[in-house]
Amino acid sequence: MGGLIQKPITLVGDGIENPWNAQTMLHAATMFNSPCRFRDRCGLSQSWMETVSADYPLPLISREELARDYAPIVAFDNLDEAESVYGFQLSRGPQPAVVVGNERRGLAKDIPLIAHHAVQIPMFSRRLNSLNVAAASAVALYYLSRGGGGKLQIRSQPNKRRPEILLMGAAHHVELGSSIRSAGAFGWGRLFVEDRQGVWFGCDRATIAEGRAAARRARNPIHVIPTMRDRRYAFAEACIITLKPIGAPLHQADLAQGPPQVIIIPDETAVELEREDWGRFARDVRFVHLSVPAQEFVYHYRLIATITLAEVARQVGQQARPGLIRPKRHEPLYDRALKLLSEKQGETVFLEELENY
């Protein structure tokens, strides 16, 4: 993957409704030393003042200011003929900007009219075709600021390259729920959760209601399996994702070795890497470094997890000739010889329940 581009990319939220999403977008921009602005079409400024901060007004921008002062402009949404963010090379210009849209409706129709590029994150789920807007913003900034990185792999049997995912120690149920949503959107049919903080399994009814508010409108499940700190496993390799400058960079690590490999994403606000017995997961353990430009920023688990999942999904790849042959959705690959966990454990979560994360 190439080095960082010289000019920071301004992140613009178009019609964002949820002020907490807006706050997380501001934090995502800070990770990449990027400014962040909002085009307020849905009363965001008022809800921001009422819920997040009455002392720190939301930085706003109009469509006219965006068109006048920024170039190139990237419309970042699932638009017709949008290019993949994987391998995308941003054209030169005085002040680049990437615009992400409303949580439910996406970009307003007048944004693509002033955009120089249309770019999207390839989704691998048949039903859930979007990420949390703040998580998508982090993925956009990660790849665009690094010149796009490698292209999406095209394989005859990509699911044979899909590793297991373990989300470890998330401190907040919304951050964890958004990460599970990302895993489902990127094509995982199951994942493991080490719920040390009790934010997902067995939490109080209010937390469950907040985290899983959307109705079950369809059947598009992901199986969430609990793991425990005292369990030992028999993976061939465990890759631990960290912001610390140790191990191979994320874009250089081989993260598509199939089910014998587990990608562990710890919440580094709650998990001390140095005190963990990583050998309980696999005979081979290596750290993988997710590098971001900023030295100080507000940590959000969903941002780290989604960037990681996006890169793993890129390496796993898509079915050959996806535009002509619809990929067959394989069932999750279980290594029965290892007897990791009983299929009866855990819970099935329908991805439509995660749309509000």
Regions found by a protein language model. Name each.
Residues 1-357:
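Post-transcriptional modification and biogenesis factors for structured RNAs
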